């Protein structure tokens, strides 16, 4: 994700060697080009659904501008993403801590996708869901990533999900030399 500098080798994302950037420049690059869905969602409980979704646009002018270009305003972008993910307008003003787990997960996905980042990193986002909810969420996530033109890096212990993805790696394969993959 670019938080820490690599101790050896190189990490290139969108043609940029992250090791060549200062800590501040890596932070800016990360917020401009990467959306995150955390396992625990990391929503700010005291903010509304809308405020949580719009948060990346407060830190990234690029993502704010992309949201405005695609939807006319940041508010409209948040509402459209939430609607596509199955959350309706009446929830926009509710506090994040008043939502069900499934609703919080969709808010986290909308926050990751707003402003069309090129890469979405999802860390165990389906671990708290039953089979039916998991399948529905994944289909929504795939559709939104496709619509935004975003690549999805999905981390899961659930091997049954592997066939849904173009490429999968096990942890044991990560430490082997691999051909570079441009994201």
Where are these regions (language model features)?
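Helix-to-loop junction immediately C-terminal to a conserved catalytic motif
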Residues: 1
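Conserved ABC transporter NBD signature motif
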Residues: 9-17
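Conserved ABC ATPase "signature" region
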Residues: 17, 66-90
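Hydrophobic anchor residue at the start of the ABC signature
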Residues: 109
